[in-house]
From Swiss-Prot:
Subcellular location: Cytoplasm
Annotated GO MF terms: rRNA (uridine-2'-O-)-methyltransferase activity
Protein name, as recorded: Ribosomal RNA large subunit methyltransferase E
InterPro entries (UniProt xref): NA-bd_OB-fold, RNA_methyltr_RlmE, RNA_MeTrfase_FtsJ_dom, rRNA-MeTfrase_E, SAM-dependent_MTases_sf, TRAM_dom
Organism lineage string: Archaea, Methanobacteriati, Methanobacteriota, Stenosarchaea group, Methanomicrobia
Sequence intervals crossing the membrane: none
Gene3D superfamilies per record: Nucleic acid-binding proteins, Vaccinia Virus protein VP39
Highest rank taxon of the organism: Archaea
Source species of the chain: Methanocella arvoryzae (strain DSM 22066 / NBRC 105507 / MRE50)
PROSITE patterns noted in UniProt: TRAM
Record-listed E.C. numbers: 2.1.1.166
GO cellular component: cytoplasm
Length: 256
């Protein structure tokens, strides 16, 4: 990124009272991907110094915002902060003492850089993996997730892992990031609480009909719409798409 552009975001952050130029990155992410809505409960992992907390509070319009970090975060009006390890069950319990459920988990944390690119990339993916695991413990069904990673040979597999746990996964390079920076944001939308995944083959019995004519089956109380199914059919089906509250499937084999 040219120095002039870099200084633009740095100076703008100072003028607007943001603690970090990274505040603009979350604004750009949300403008395009709508991960935070009015009234949402947001948890920021690795939140110090608090630039993303400030923006999250603006975006969620009165919803709760909680920041977690090993470092102390200077107070922000309307924001709860927890000094603790995000992986600790005690820290996670403290979050649930404040809120019943979490709509969005965000993480702009980065590892301490060594100057060894391969090592820094691996540490970045490891940190993002920890954030993903914590997010799956906090998020409600249909919740959203965004995390920063450094691109490298482990990057694509990480994006795939996010895709397994959310109904939609994508990546975003913020215009507020330095042009030469390898940082990129991985976004997951529609957190999946079911164990079903696209491509799974399962045996079901159609027990109802949907309004559009698809058969309805239940797998561990999760609704699956089966194209061409009729009530009473015993079928082997293949999952074609999974949403937070239901899935779609095609018939592989019908029991005779």
């Amino acid at each position: 990124m040219p120095a002039k552009k870099r200084d633009h975001y740095y100076n703008k952050a100072k003028q607007m009272g943001y603690r970090s130029r990274a505040s603009f990155k979350l604004q750009f992410i949300n403008k395009k991907h709508h991960i935070i809505k009015k009234g949402d409960t947001v948890v920021d992992l690795g939140a110090a110094p608090g630039g993303w907390l400030q923006v999250a509070k603006e975006l969620n319009g009165g919803g709760k915002v909680i920041g977690v970090d090993l470092q102390r975060i200077e107070p922000i009006e309307g924001v709860e902060t927890i000094k603790g390890d995000m992986t600790s069950p005690e820290t996670q319990a403290r979050i649930f003492e404040i809120v019943d459920e979490v709509d969005t988990v965000i993480c702009d944390a980065a590892p301490n850089l060594s100057g060894n690119w391969a090592l820094d990339h691996a540490r970045s993916i490891d940190l993002a993996t920890v954030a993903l695991d914590v997010a799956t413990k906090l998020l409600k069904k249909g919740g959203n997730f965004v995390v920063k990673v450094f691109q490298g040979d482990l990057y694509e597999n990480y994006v795939k892992e996010v895709g397994k746990r959310f109904s939609y996964a994508t990546t975003y390079k913020s215009q507020a990031s330095r042009q030469q920076s390898a940082e990129i944001y991985v976004i997951g939308k529609g957190f999946l609480t079911t164990s079903l995944r696209k491509g799974d083959v399962v045996d079901v019995t159609i027990d109802a009909m949907g309004k559009t004519g698809d058969g309805i089956a239940h797998v561990d109380d999760f609704v699956v719409f089966v194209k061409g199914g009729s009530v009473g059919d015993k079928l082997k089906i293949k999952i074609t798409d999974v949403k937070p509250s239901f899935a779609f499937a095609d018939i592989v084999e019908k029991e005779k």
